[in-house]
Amino acid sequence: MRLGVIGTGTIATAAMRGIAGDGHQITVSRRSAANAEGLTRDFPNVSVADNQTVLDQSDVVFVALLAGDAPRILRELAFRPDQQVITLMTGISPDEVAALTAPAPVVAQMLPFPAVANGGSPIIVLGAPDLVQALFGARNRIFALRDAAEMDAYLCAQALLSPVARMVADAAGWLGARVDDAPQAEAFLRTLIASSLADMESNALVQALNTPGGYNQRLRLHMEASGMGQALVAGLDALEGGA
């Protein structure tokens, strides 16, 4: 396919890295020049151009601008009715983006994560998932959502990633101070968390780790008594309320 990217930020760059080896002709905008140059250096089928040339050379266009910049930038561009647009933006609805890219339709809003560069990542999709599935589904899991309300809820819940990473980093620091190989200690914890959650539903995993008096049960009960669950739900509610 002929793919174009308007706004070559971190997530859009990761997405293109994940599929650049599949034979697509990819044209990316000069925005975030370091990311664009890295793609062209690593993949001979990726080129850099100004925004309008990106459109002229593309049949599928990924729009990955900051929501506040999108109206100003997109209004200056001429889209074609035969193009398909995938928005990677939050803070601006697919309908609002479609008004800016007309006559090209927005077929989906897609929210990947940095791991999409290597595969094995979740990708949230609102709209028609077929095109996203065709491009990314071989290496990643596509989660198709019903409507904008579901997208908003998923956006809030995915913020769990940062606190979980913080907890793993803190535990790795604690462990690393007590063993000879601190990098190995962190690698162990990351592998432990990732593999355990990948292989079992979370509630089932909690029960499997609920041996009376065991290390896992004792630490979980300590964390729960400290208000971990209430703090998490309060934080999610605050995100949902726009805080």
State what each model feature region is.
Residues 105, 187-243:
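NAD(P)-dependent Rossmann-like dehydrogenase/reductase catalytic/cofactor-binding core
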Residues 1-56, 173-177:
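NAD(P)+-binding Rossmann beta1-loop-alpha1 motif at the extreme N-terminus of oxidoreductases
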Residues 19, 77, 113:
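Short, positively charged
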Residues 46, 50-101:
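Rossmann-fold NAD(P) dinucleotide-binding segment
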Residues 42, 96-106, 121-199, 242:
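Internal alpha-helical scaffold of NAD(P)-dependent oxidoreductase catalytic cores
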